Amino acid sequence: MSTLKSLLPLAAALNACAQANVQSSRVTVGSSCANDAAIIVPAGFCASIFADNLGRARYLAIAPNNDVYVSIEGTRPGQQAPLPAFIALRDTDHDGRADRIERVGSKGNTGIALRDGFLYVDQGEVITRYRMTADLVPASPPDTVVSGLPLNPGHRARNFVIAPDGSLYVNVGSPDNSCQVKDRALESPGKDPCEELSTRAGIWKFDARKLNQKFDPAARFATGARNSTGMAIGPDGQLYANTHGRDQLTENWPRIFPDSMYGHENPAESLLEVNRGDDFGWPYCFYSVAEKRLVDAPEYGGDGKKTTRCADKKPPLAIFPAHWAPLDLLFYTGSNFPKRYRNGVFITFHGSWNRMKGMQAGGKIIFQPLANGRPTGPFEIFADEFAGVPPAEINPARAKHRPVGLAVAPDGSLFVADDDGGRIYRITYTGKR
């Protein structure tokens, strides 16, 4: 049986689990959690604040000596004040909070990673790398690894992941919602073919060990993923990614989807298993929660049921509620958390803006159990209430904090970056073994 066919029933079965939750509890201030971060985590866990007010903190990398590096988004159109490429943090007195904070470079964006003595940094159109030393801050200017990466318009987040063999996988998000002739316009048809797929909405592969590479459509590794802001190499060496589903099914196609609840619940957000040549369907298809499969997009003649354009597209490995906006993806490799968390993946969700009024989803972190690269049950809410406002008031403008990047420290604690309040959380397990 082909991989594509074998995943179809799995994706359908997972749909029934997509709204699942587990019981969680608020951590109270105590001797094991002196600076409570006021988010919800499971019983036995402690969420504390490692650093605060850093600006638009995006993704994280942590060195073997516990130094923390966080990318700072500085590529937004209309950006006025100059921002650093990244911030370097050190806890010199070992009290659980950063006390040395250094701002380095200029014009950061999203991705950041440590590999083989280098710090790799996404700077929008380029990915650079700094040679690391024993000091917190690199002593020499960066070298260019890849240049010419598409940035504007549309999705600018440039997450990347480096495999053990040096392969550099780079997300290049779509420039628009669904490749319409007029983006996000009422009943505007889709461009057919969607020519932007040659340079956007996919994952590109380069070599992290080589300098001065140029972006090239021929380097595309996988396509049809609208915006894969989270990527990770699993324990099995496999590349995994998540991707954002499209928006505005009801708003742009009310004659096909007259019930506003349809656009509220569709399409699902997705976790993907990525191999060379994979096509995940965007913009021609979206994952219908109701049909439990990929269906034709309305821009390409779809009615919410047809699958004419989707038979050869690869379905997701797991699905999650619509418009939650998945960001980072992390396989837990530490020893601090209970053993069950070493068999699955953590995903941050930034929170929604286009669910129904009064029913937006705030930022959260989920845990998806996996075994041998396959889901073994429903996802669980691991950390919640980052927004810090009542549920009916949740929206991006009101949220106080929104989780983005994840990283595991040498002691097994989980670090989380927040790009609204500029906070870095540190989550540890202090419960019974």
What are these regions (language model features)?
Residues D93-R100, L136-V137, Q213:
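Acidic, glycine-anchored loop motifs typical of Ca2+
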Residues A63-N65, L114-D116, I162-D165, I233-D236, ...:
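Residue-level detector of Asp-centered blade-edge/turn motifs that repeat once per structural unit
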Residues A407-R433:
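Blade-level signature of beta-propeller repeat domains, shared across WD40, Kelch, NHL, RCC1
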Residues F50-L54, E102-K107, V145-N152, A219-T223, ...:
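Surface loop/turn motifs at the tips and blade-to-blade linkers of beta-strand repeat domains
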Residues D67-S71, F118-V121, S167-N171, Q238-N242, ...:
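Conserved beta-propeller blade signature
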Residues N21-V41, A157, S174-D216, T223-N227, ...:
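Beta-propeller domain segments
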